[in-house]
């Protein structure tokens, strides 16, 4: 699915709720503004996709909830690749396809997702350790020393892989906002200098992803930042 959230698209979306939304419900976020360009117009609340089982019943419930939320005035949708072992992103992708059939365009919706936690794939039925070795270690996407706390990585090759997987799961070619997910997970595992080096390398990759059009903005999703 082409394109991304745009100022024109999000304003068109907000205009549908001109008489029903509370004053100030839609606004221009400073953090998603580029000098000289109009900012997107986003709802004051969004819908997240964190909890639930990675099964078809939950998939359908999430898809229906996202469609209902967007039809009700919410145009910010958040996820992460590890949420429900990639199924939350896929449920968003299904919702986007359904909404397109209902006349709601991709450029009206602001999508954010995250990468950093190493996650299995709910669509894979084999051993998770074998999956990890096949998908990440053997191809050289991850080295053992890249992994912190047994669950987290933010090396450029890993983030590139995760972003590409997220784009496929979502069925889009650009994510509006991409977060490094809880990078502080690594703070107690590696020296501070090494942590900062890893974070700089992650940002360098994310800058390249902006340049190639795979993401629009990036940042950190952190509890302890």
Question: What role is predicted for each listed range?
Answer:
Residues 135-225:
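Glycine/proline-rich, positively charged
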Residues 1-131, 205, 211:
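N-terminal binding-site loop/beta-alpha segment at the start of enzyme catalytic domains
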């Amino acid at each position: 699915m082409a394109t991304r959230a745009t100022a024109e698209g999000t304003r068109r979306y907000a205009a549908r709720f001109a008489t029903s939304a509370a004053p100030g419900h839609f606004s221009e976020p400073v953090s998603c503004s580029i000098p000289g360009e109009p900012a997107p117009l986003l709802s004051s609340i969004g819908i997240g996709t964190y909890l639930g089982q990675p099964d078809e019943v939950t998939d359908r419930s999430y898809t229906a909830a996202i469609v209902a939320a967007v039809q009700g005035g919410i145009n910010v949708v958040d996820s992460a690749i590890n949420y429900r072992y990639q199924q939350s992103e896929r449920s968003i992708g299904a919702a986007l396809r359904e909404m397109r059939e209902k006349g709601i365009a991709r450029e009206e919706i602001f999508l954010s997702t995250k990468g950093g936690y190493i996650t299995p794939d709910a669509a894979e039925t084999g051993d998770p350790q074998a999956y990890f070795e096949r998908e990440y270690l053997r191809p050289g996407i991850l080295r053992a020393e890249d992994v912190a706390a047994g669950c987290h990585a933010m090396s450029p090759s890993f983030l590139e892989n995760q972003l590409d997987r997220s784009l496929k799961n979502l069925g889009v070619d650009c994510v509006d906002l991409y977060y490094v997910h809880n990078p502080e997970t690594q703070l107690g595992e590696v020296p501070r200098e090494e942590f900062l080096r890893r974070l700089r390398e992650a940002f360098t990759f994310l800058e390249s992803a902006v340049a190639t059009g795979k993401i629009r903005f990036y940042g950190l999703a952190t509890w302890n930042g």
